[in-house]
Amino acid sequence: MTASEIDIRKILKLLPHRYPILLVDRVLEFEPQKRIKTLKNVTINEPYFMGHFPDQPVMPGVMILEALAQSAGLLTFGADMERKEGALYYFVGIDGARFKRVVYPGDQLHLNVTVERYIRGIWKFKASATVDGEVACEAELMCTVKQAEG
């Protein structure tokens, strides 16, 4: 499966997120079980800009981390190109998160996620978000896939 084959319809099949929480617009590069590069077009229409901050809109760091986690989810589910019925992808940890550049409306956020390892059901990823080649955020993410409860 190539990056061009993972269009928005496939993203919507692989991720359970929907507006306003879906934070991946496109897959740019994809190596199954190795790495993924995705794109988030940051627009003033994002609902969080109404309060963060009205006179100086800035993308919240937690939303950048969420976009990275969703990219990691695509990397995990993308290997099989399907999300098992009832399976959800859970964040279980973040290490070393650093925010190095402010992200504004109009920016294109490039999300880079690489598999570091997979042990006992826990995926560990190295992740970074860049704007115009400049690092905005970097972190190590830990995630797991589990059946939804209830």
From Swiss-Prot:
Signal peptide: none annotated. The active site is at H52. Its EC number is 4.2.1.59. One of its GO terms (biological process) is lipid A biosynthetic process. Keywords: Cytoplasm, Lipid A biosynthesis, Lipid biosynthesis, Lipid metabolism, Lyase. GO terms for cellular component: cytoplasm; membrane. One of its GO terms (molecular function) is (3R)-hydroxyacyl-[acyl-carrier-protein] dehydratase activity. It is an enzyme of class 4 (lyase). InterPro entries: FabA_FabZ, FabZ, HotDog_dom_sf. Its main location: cytoplasm. It catalyses: a (3R)-hydroxyacyl-[ACP] = a (2E)-enoyl-[ACP] + H2O. Pfam families: FabA (PF07977). It is found in: Cytoplasm. Involved in unsaturated fatty acids biosynthesis. Catalyzes the dehydration of short chain beta-hydroxyacyl-ACPs and long chain saturated and unsaturated beta-hydroxyacyl-ACPs. Belongs to the thioester dehydratase family. FabZ subfamily. This is 3-hydroxyacyl-[acyl-carrier-protein] dehydratase FabZ. The gene is fabZ.
